From Swiss-Prot:
A GO CC term attached to the entry: cytoplasm
Pfam families per the UniProt record, alphabetical: HGTP_anticodon (PF03129), tRNA-synt_His (PF13393)
GO terms of molecular function: ATP binding; catalytic activity, acting on a protein; histidine-tRNA ligase activity; transferase activity
Signal sequence residues: none
PANTHER family reported in the protein's UniProt record: HISTIDINE--TRNA LIGASE, MITOCHONDRIAL-RELATED, HISTIDYL-TRNA SYNTHETASE
Domain of life where this protein originates: Bacteria
Keywords: Aminoacyl-tRNA synthetase, ATP-binding, Cytoplasm, Ligase, Nucleotide-binding, Protein biosynthesis
Keyword Coiled coil: no
Record's subunit section: Homodimer.
UniProt name for this protein: Histidine--tRNA ligase
Amino acid sequence: MLTSRPRGTEDILPEEVGRWYLLENTAREVSRLYGYREIRTPIFEHTELFNRGVGDTSDIVEKEMYTFIDRGDRSLTLRPEGTAPVVRAFVEHSLEARGLPVKLFYLGPMFRYGRPQAGRLRQFHQFGVEAFGSRDPALDAEVIALAMDFYTRLGLKDLELHLNSVGCPACRPAHREKLKAYLRPRLEELCPTCQGRFERNPLRIFDCKSPACQEIVREAPTVTASLCPDCAGHFHRVQEYLKALGIEFILDEHLVRGLDYYTKTAFEIMVKGIGAQSSIGGGGRYDGLVAALGGKQVPGIGFGLGLERVLLALEIQGQEPPPEGGVDVLVVTAGTGVDLAAFRLLAGLRAAGIRADKDYLERSLKGQMKYANRYPARMAVILGEEELARGRVSVRRLDAGSQEEVPLAAVVDYCRKMKESGW
């Protein structure tokens, strides 16, 4: 057990890290293009934050949270999602005082207890954005566009945007009563979880994955048919903005998302043809969440995207990001009197922004060259006693097999120019 990772977790090995760099760098790049700034919150929070913020009828709170009592007898929970912690930070630090809107993004690990499967781990990673301070439907469209932009920059294809409105506190009560009236005669046919949701939050039954429950709600009254004029107008404008951006979408009246805080716009992004884990992200508007967590009446909208699912989708589509490479230059030594000069050369290469390394296992010249190819390195700079005495080094291009002598004093500049020319 000491040498086995916990079930539902993964080690990201060095050769896999390059894929994560690509995802994280793309997320940061596209977020900044849209005017979002990074925020980092603790990986654990007070349990009450998620009970109140995520909702006690959600699957997350009911059965997926990693909760523990610390030595101060405080109930703490490893964060299962990113929105509630960001909202907590927004309230705690009075970020609205700095001027609205406030547009933030985050990257980091989340934790949910569930059955591990491909693309669905107990420790997983999310990229998310949260925008506070505006009810403008254009902001909804911007948030959706940012998510779609992220995916397309990675090369993902066959994306489907599912869109719905889940209403607001003004129009949901009427739909709630219609839905309960429809479900009441078939209450005993619902799964035990949905039977428990019937009184507390029947809208969540639309989100149930049970085939029996899905069949029952197939003809159920949807919240879209009960929208108040404000919600209906808002939803119409969101669609207009998406059309103006050329973003195609599917109206999905059964889409409610799995969290209780959503109001008005809800969306989910799926990839066709990748099996059960076709949903790779989603989000929506939460105009009451900031106030519910003790802040002012500040509206918000955001999304959370699972990065493991993105990697799975890229792999299935043959668009998998390239693995992390080795180094640009391996400094190879021949003889015992060149170690200090080689070490100085290594430092000079790194100072010039060139990824460089050397052999620390005292291999032979032949062994070092094999190591350079296996690393892999683009070039080997070979420094021997005879070359050092003449102030020269040999530079070998490992891909082409060509080799030339270069003055030792000029080799760093030589390598820098090679890098600038694309090697």
